Amino acid sequence: MNKFAVVEKQFEYKGHDCICIFGCLGYRCGYVSVDDNKEFNEYDIECHCGLSFSGTLPYDYGQKETYYIGFDCGHICDGNDYNLALKYGLIDEKRFNELLEMQILSPTFLQPVRSLEYVEEQCKKIVDQLEKENESNE
């Protein structure tokens, strides 16, 4: 098991492999497979706070393709769910207490934690934009 993150959901949408993970820092990320190896900043894609990843994923994410683009929900407008990180075994009790103390002082303290459903919808939104771009290039 990857001690940095767990895969909460993996699904196929319009031929793209989509992976939603929850990480040890208490927030989710979403990844979508792509056929090209462009950098994330070369895409004109709207999603939660913009794309922040392009590349290969860790082997234990169970990826079905080679290259992915993705986004994270670890921004100033996002909250952290350290309870879930503890439940998933991504952090221990000591780290949980440290993070909780720091969180109270953080500007993200009262921000919403992005749900699995939200991340799934953002992945679909990315795919829809990729497909629309492919149609206009044909």
Describe every region a protein language model picked out:
Residues 2-50:
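Amphipathic, interaction-prone secondary-structure segments
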Residues 9-12, 41-138:
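Polybasic, proline/glycine-rich intrinsically disordered low-complexity segments
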